[in-house]
From Swiss-Prot:
Oligomeric form and interacting partners: Homodimer.
Name the record gives this protein: D-aminoacyl-tRNA deacylase
CDD domains for this protein: Dtyr_deacylase
Pfam name, any one: Tyr_Deacylase
PANTHER family: D-AMINOACYL-TRNA DEACYLASE 1 (PTHR10472:SF5), D-TYROSYL-TRNA TYR DEACYLASE (PTHR10472)
UniProt motif Gly-cisPro motif, important for rejection of L-amino acids: location: 137-138
SUPFAM superfamilies: DTD-like
Main location as per UniProt: cytoplasm
InterPro entries linked to this entry: Daa-tRNA_deacyls_DTD, DTD-like_sf
GO MF, one example: D-tyrosyl-tRNA(Tyr) deacylase activity
Catalytic activity: glycyl-tRNA(Ala) + H2O = tRNA(Ala) + glycine + H(+); a D-aminoacyl-tRNA + H2O = a tRNA + a D-alpha-amino acid + H(+)
Organism: Thermoanaerobacter sp. (strain X514)
Length: 149
């Protein structure tokens, strides 16, 4: 499982010109689910997202998590994060999970983040979306449940 976590002032998702989800301060998380992901990857990712300390404390140090600031998550499924561009010029998406299975793990990730005390809004699975991301910093973190960046 791969995620791009962006610290935001606000974020929103629109489908067909209509805003379907929005958040204030927190994270917009673009998540790609791989063919070899399982529940352990979901638990790892949920824990990382909720406890990632990238919000400033009173001294200006990145020391606070979503839980500490009462932040929200806007979780958007993005299979293109699994695109392999090492060969050729067109991405190979063979590592992206099939939609039915990906949706199962996506929903589990939503539930696991919420269980840990953070409000989650989502995009629309398998839809063409417009994602508004008002970065704060910017602070962008890459997380992969199987690789170290």
């Amino acid at each position: 499982m791969r995620a791009v976590v962006q610290r935001v002032i606000r974020g929103e998702v629109s489908v067909d010109g209509e805003v379907i989800s929005s958040i204030g301060k927190g994270f917009v998380v673009l998540v790609g689910i791989s063919v070899d992901d399982n529940e352990n990857d979901v638990m790892y990712m949920a824990d990382k997202i909720v406890n990632l300390r990238v919000f400033e404390d009173e001294e200006g140090k990145m020391n606070l998590s979503l839980l500490d600031i009462g932040g929200e998550v806007l979780l958007v499924s993005q299979f293109t994060l699994l695109g392999d561009v090492r060969k050729g010029r067109r991405p190979n998406f063979m590592m992206a999970q099939k939609p039915e299975e990906a949706l199962k793990y996506f929903n589990l990730l939503v539930n696991e983040i919420e269980k840990r005390g953070v409000s989650v809004k989502t995009g629309k699975f398998q839809a063409m979306m417009k994602v508004l991301i008002e970065n704060d910093g910017p602070v962008t973190i890459l997380i992969d449940s199987k690789k170290i960046f």
